Amino acid sequence: MCQDQNNTTNENCCLANILEVIVKLQERSEKFDCLGDGCDRPFLGPTPATVCYNTRPVTFYHCSSGSLWTFPYTLNGSSDVSSVFRCEHVEGCCATCRVLAPNPDSSTVSSTPYIPTETFFTINLNCVGALRCLPDTFIACS
């Protein structure tokens, strides 16, 4: 195994620390009105399209093989697999993630490339060798 499997805290788990920051950013984004343009808006820079993001999608890579993690999901009666996830919760060296599916609506895929599924899983971050952050986006999570 890649790391000490008895590690139950995120003290020595750098991936958990990174994912905790992502979860906090995602939670914080839900508390703001994205259309605000005053001094108290929660972001810097211009907002020409007035798009407010609430998700930083991630992918995980196996520690031993370096291959991309995938997880099965069912959406609208069709089953598939995805390698793109939204981290929802981190506890110790484990993360609970939601599987994100490719957006089938080609007219909005440039602004919202993923849609949420109702498939969740918990991953032991000691088994993950690397994670990759994808461009921030908006996911209509309930």
Q: Residue spans of the language-model regions?
A:
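Short glycine-rich, low-complexity segments
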Residues: M1-E91, R98-S142
